[in-house]
């Protein structure tokens, strides 16, 4: 510790320092004394070391605490000295230092007192700890003595334990020996018990034997007694008999005896008698023995002789017994089989009865369902009639609009003709041709309608004969036929008046527009409303008139067909058209004979009629009827379906609604793909052939132009068709069973359609021989008939035939030939959901129709909104380009060129809409 001079000079500080030193000495002394006072004992080294450690800890703690306190006090002194030295004045500084020193001294004294108390406390604890250490040392000494005693006891106990174990082993051996002895004794005991039981059983048996023997003895005694009695009785009897005999003898020899008596004794006489009797008895005995011996010998001989027979008899008996047992066993088995068979028979009878009842129930249910379907057919016919009425009204309105449009068009054409000479010059000849063609075609329209109604009536009559329900249906169909005839006649008359101006422009386009005409009428009419362009409306109206002409030409008599052929005489295929018509007539006759099959097809047609009516466009029913090759089948008349081309599609109408749905949308009355397909293939034969011939004269390029022109309206139709199919597939699903029945007639219908196709392909295919060959092959194959324009079309038809979509392809190809590739696009969309553009491209050849056909986009468009129209417009724009290329070459040809121009402008407008 460091102390300043000031602090040492100060007496109070010196006093404090000395006190701290003295306290330090005390503190340091106390531990030393405590350390010395510890008692050392000669215990175990562990105890000594522990006590030493504990004794050393306390003084060290005390010493360290004392040192800390001294250091603190020194610090305090240094601080106080610094305060004293740092004072400003001698007087004030001294007072302050004194007051501070007092406070510091008080604090230090308090701390010192606390340290002293702590030291006393620690000394007390050291004493207690030393006492504990001493006690522990004593305990350790006592524990050592106890350990020796315990060890001795443990040794003794171990010895005793070993002895006990030895004794235990000996006892265990003894117990084992005893157990063996016990086991052995048990065995002996059991054996003795068995012997005792055996002896007791023998005793019981002997007792029984004794009892039996005693009984036998008693019986024998009784027999002996009875025999003795019998012997006595026999003796008495014998004696009596002897006495009697003697009496008799004596009586007979009385005199003699009397004499003898006098001489002999009775005893001698008795002896003589006895001797005589004995001699007689001996003789009798000998005789009996001899007889017995002889008899016995004879019997033994007979027995020996019969032994063999007896043995054989015994063997036979044994054999018979064995056979009897086997037969009895067989009998039991046969009885079991009989019972099982009877049970099976009863089960089979029960099952048969149950099945019979179930079949009867199913038959009843089917009959009820048949009645219900017939009533539904009647209801659908009524709905169909109502829709036809609506259609006729709409046709009238369309005709009125057409007149207005024609008037405007004539004014526009006159105005344009004054400006552009060549175009004006082309129009007048076109109007002449249209006037000539339309009246011829429209007149057959009425006839075609009559034929369609009559066929329905005949088929329904056949059904009436079968059931009363069918009679009701026939009545309904007759009423419908009358109303349809009237309405159709009115519509036909109006159409005949109106389409003259339209045919002037559309004369060359009749063939491409024919198949799509019904659809073009409705759907292009909607386009006209949306776009507000009169040019497309005129095209739609022209298509309507063309379709009406087609339907009329097909259903007219041979005279009307001859007229159509004269008109078609301009082309090279007039003979082919006549042949196709003759084939159609033959098919009509064959189908009239097949009334039963027609009835089924009539049901199908009836079911399909309401569907046709349901579709928004009413144009198709009239056109379909006109287009269908006369009464080939109600399906063809109603559906005009190339669906019959492959029965797969009819069946697939419900499962594969893609084609039926879109096709239905294409034509309101179209039953499904049937109408669209029928529209293209069937009507081509009479009227379309003429139109196609005219087109052939113009060239295939013109046909392609017309196809392109129609692609836009057809695409718009596709949109509507896609919307309509949603409701149609459900109807077809319900009608699918009835449609499947009509498959047989459908095949015949396809043949007629094939004939038409062949005619058309021949007309168009004279420049192209390959197309004709493919169409002929398609007529044979069924699915390859219609794809004839190019080799690619044939291959595509085959692919579609696998999917049940051949009908769509056939229609598409036919339409592309005469009416434009627009149909192919629509139907391709319906069936495959894929682009049929490759087929169209191949058909187009060098005209770049590939750009026009994009069927996938058509499928995506389900609404009639501007989006779907825009996509179709894009196609029409490409068509416009193609048309422009051909316009230069074919301007001299009829209004087709003019219509191409109109379509071009319309397509351009649509293109602008798309870009927006």
Swiss-Prot record:
Region annotation Disordered: where it falls in the sequence: 1-51, 485-851
Region (6 X 13 AA approximate tandem repeats of K-S-P-V-[PS]-K-S-P-V-E-E-[KA]-[GAK]): 614-691
Biased composition (Low complexity): 21-44
Biased composition, class Basic and acidic residues, residue ranges: 542-561, 583-614, 686-701, 707-742, 755-778, 788-828, 839-851
Region Coil 2A, residue ranges: 266-287
Sequence segments annotated as region (Tail): 413-916
PROSITE patterns the UniProt entry points to: IF_ROD_1, IF_ROD_2
Main subcellular location: cytoplasm
Sequence repeats: 614-626, 627-639, 640-652, 653-665, 666-678, 679-691
Renumbered residue ranges of the record's region Linker 1: 137-149
GO CC annotations on file: axon; intermediate filament; intermediate filament cytoskeleton; neurofibrillary tangle; neurofilament; postsynaptic intermediate filament cytoskeleton
UniProt xrefs under SUPFAM superfamilies: Intermediate filament protein, coiled coil region
Span list, region Coil 1A: 105-136
Region: Coil 2B, residue numbers: 292-412
Span list, region Linker 2: 288-291
Sequence similarity: Belongs to the intermediate filament family.
UniProt protein name: Neurofilament medium polypeptide
Native source organism of the sequence: Homo sapiens (Human)
Record gene name: NEFM
